[in-house]
């Protein structure tokens, strides 16, 4: 899981197929090791539970997208399409009112829960109430808390009344598009409970998705069975088995001996080894996520734009991608994904240490005898914080040390356990850091005010960077005053350019999702979403 915060997103991946050797075919032309219509998946982690309202684990997002359903999803090209809703609400189709405060969702009439009960508007209303219920340990209420009330005039109509206009709502209300994936829960089973934090449902879920929960042998495997009554059609797979394998190298070996058909989380360091496996197809799926270097602008030195610019020019981004990401990452140009209406193809930050030194010279930062620059009694002496559980985090921090030293800055490294560095009492959320490196998901909608706005410093929002850019704020706020995509796009293009030029954060690389699979797997593609498995009912093997 990544903070945010982490939308994982991918267009249908182009396969990069490794060398193959001739094998005796099994039934239907399959390889001998393929089990017809049974997909074996592996991951090094195990879910904490299955409740889509309570977890922030990427694996839970994946599993829940098979068991539960959403109102709106994205296809493999990033286009929004209806799932439980028959269409995406827009101004043009009347789903969004002219004042932007009323949203109407029309629901499918052919959906049943795995226990046979009908799915209705009451389920949507109940799940929203569960999200905003303070007794539930729900994270990421952003968007849901903008709703004043929900009406259900009939079983298949849901009407949202917002407290005020909020254009990102469609991309955040029961969608799998970004961090905080939330599927719809069954009201007939859960309504009336004080909370849903510790209930049997969380380990034996009932959903409306293409596969239904069968069993969970903790520490070993999870079995999902085909939902014969799935509303989009009978799934082609009979069974999906999730195998819990404790480490990445063991997963690689399981793929090598063909005990596993699909791995969607192999680390970049093993990417070349996966590509070298015979009879295994390997792809790189674009993913709406970034690794970023954040700068605490509450520190006087980092509040200086010249210092932030110099840091951005001291970094060799291509070397990070080739040496640390093993070619899996790509150069970033914006802090929103390419599918977003606000995406702006900014020039990438350039690697130019000489220019970085010149910028600092011009701003009055002069080298001391030890080579570290100083000005008015302040030194460019920093500490970078990273997660002790992230191999890439340590590698990046180590990579940055000589890079910053070359332009007159000192950088020490401090590693924290994952649950400490991202705790609300940890160094990031208490602004007790200089620099930090981590990965996050990019929001599908270009609205970033909650993360970078002047009024949203934590705990009022998720601005843990000390950023306050008046021009950026003005443009972001204007983008929330209209639901017209064309008008919003113009405003967010300006906002993205302003943020880029002010070096609010430094994106180091865009992530891509390595995927390794049995070449007998058919119709598999990933979507630009935190829960990327948008068409699992069509998969077959």
What are these regions (language model features)?
Residues 40, 120-127, 155-161, 165, ...:
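Alpha-helical secondary-structure segments
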Residues 141-191:
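Surface-exposed binding/hinge segments that line
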Residues 22, 131, 149-150, 214-225, ...:
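Extracellular/periplasmic solute-recognition and catalytic clefts
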Residues 88-137, 159, 254, 301-303:
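Aromatic- and charge-enriched surface segment that lines or borders ligand/interaction sites
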Residues 199-202, 226-273, 398-402, 410-412, ...:
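Ligand-site clamp/hinge motif
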Residues 217, 221, 291, 314-347, ...:
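Detector for C-terminal structural segments
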